[in-house]
Amino acid sequence: MRKIVNQAEKNFTVVKYDIKNEEMIEYLTRMATLSNNLTNTVIYHQRQWYFYTQNVYYTEHPNEHFKPYQYNAELIDELKECMYEYNQRKAEQNKKQTDFIAFGLDAHFLHEYYKKTGQPDYTNDELSAQVAQQVTRKVSQTFKAFRKALTDYFKNPEKYEACPQLPRYNKKRRSL
């Protein structure tokens, strides 16, 4: 998803560290692996919800070129049940309820959902809660940016070289 816009060049300084302590290498590799696994878990949930909402949209707005997406119906039912409870709690607190169909899954909802379901990648004892929340927040921001870019693409396709692509899973890394 690239915009054709002139941007100022950005300069980066790259610092390479040669870590000789085997315990530190193992620790950093383990943290990177856990973080990567959580990232892929959040991406999976976000993608499944996106597929579901696209099917709902095109059921209401038929299009001859649309091919329905496959999605995990059990996961969607579980998410919808948790969303209902989430919005009920917000209503009790006199807060605005979240429209998940229009806005997708936000990081705060996913945080509550993962804690409630005991998602192993999120509640892992080795990965701190702060890191887990940050990973969830970053992936949610990526999907929010994707939806915004996709909407803008359909309004102004000339600004883009190609249609924005759905965020993909991270590859598993073997070592640092």
Language-model features: where?
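Nucleic-acid substrate recognition interfaces
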Residues: 1-176
